[in-house]
């Protein structure tokens, strides 16, 4: 049983050496250890505060990013709307100009057709007049073989000219 229950002298020397070690540690070791623990605690507290600030800043940045994305989407929508309006305007203007050009072209073609028609009518009238003169000349030559018929014809024509004027 001596192993389980130490002698009283051994207990005395164990308590004395424990007290001396404890006193030395209390005087020199514990203040250093406490100072190191407090320094570590301060460092951890500062790190936690920095982490909180970083989280808050991250949240603000995230909100700002979302606001920027929302503004960009709004701006994109506005730009798309303006582009669609501009496209419609350009299409409208192009159609309008095409209609004007087509109308001008149509008017020019109509005018050209009218000019050609008038020229054709004049040409036909000239040809009819020439044919009429040729026919009249041939008829008159046949009918006016004698002098008296010629003089009668001249008198009738002069009378017609005078009555018309």
Curated annotation (Swiss-Prot):
Keywords: ATP synthesis, Cell inner membrane, Cell membrane, CF(0), Hydrogen ion transport, Ion transport, Membrane, Transmembrane, Transmembrane helix, Transport
S-S bridge residues: none
GO MF term list: proton-transporting ATP synthase activity, rotational mechanism; proton-transporting ATPase activity, rotational mechanism
TM helices/strands, residue ranges: 10-30
InterPro entries, alphabetized: ATP_synth_b/b'su_bac/chlpt, ATP_synth_F0_bsu_bac, ATP_synthase_B_chain
Protein localization: Cell inner membrane
Gene Ontology terms: cellular component: plasma membrane; proton-transporting ATP synthase complex
One Pfam family it belongs to: ATP-synt_B
Top-rank lineage group of the source organism: Bacteria
Membrane topology reported for the UniProt record: Single-pass membrane protein
Record function comment: F(1)F(0) ATP synthase produces ATP from ADP in the presence of a proton or sodium gradient. F-type ATPases consist of two structural domains, F(1) containing the extramembraneous catalytic core and F(0) containing the membrane proton channel, linked together by a central stalk and a peripheral stalk. During catalysis, ATP synthesis in the catalytic domain of F(1) is coupled via a rotary mechanism of the central stalk subunits to proton translocation. Component of the F(0) channel, it forms part of the peripheral stalk, linking F(1) to F(0).
Assembly with partners or alone: F-type ATPases have 2 components, F(1) - the catalytic core - and F(0) - the membrane proton channel. F(1) has five subunits: alpha(3), beta(3), gamma(1), delta(1), epsilon(1). F(0) has three main subunits: a(1), b(2) and c(10-14). The alpha and beta chains form an alternating ring which encloses part of the gamma chain. F(1) is attached to F(0) by a central stalk formed by the gamma and epsilon chains, while a peripheral stalk is formed by the delta and b chains.
Family as reported in the entry's similarity comment: Belongs to the ATPase B chain family.
Database matches in NCBIfam families: ATP_synt_b (TIGR01144)
Protein known as: ATP synthase subunit b
Source organism of the structure: Bacteroides fragilis (strain ATCC 25285 / DSM 2151 / CCUG 4856 / JCM 11019 / LMG 10263 / NCTC 9343 / Onslow / VPI 2553 / EN-2)
């Amino acid at each position: 049983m001596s192993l389980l229950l130490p002698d009283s002298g051994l207990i005395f020397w164990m308590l004395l050496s424990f007290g001396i070690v404890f006193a030395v540690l209390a005087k020199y070791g514990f203040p250093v250890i406490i100072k190191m623990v407090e320094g570590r605690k301060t460092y951890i507290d500062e790190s936690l505060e920095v982490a909180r600030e970083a989280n808050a800043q991250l949240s603000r940045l995230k909100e700002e990013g979302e606001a920027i994305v929302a503004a960009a989407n709004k701006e994109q929508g506005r730009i798309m709307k303006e582009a669609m309006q501009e496209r419609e305007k350009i299409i409208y203007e192009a159609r309008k100009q095409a209609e004007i050009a087509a109308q001008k072209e149509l008017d020019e073609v109509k005018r050209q057709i009218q000019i050609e028609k008038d020229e054709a009518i004049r040409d036909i009238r000239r040809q009819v007049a020439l044919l009429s003169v040729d026919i009249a000349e041939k008829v008159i030559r046949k009918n006016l073989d004698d002098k008296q018929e010629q003089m009668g014809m001249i008198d009738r024509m002069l009378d017609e000219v005078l009555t018309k004027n």
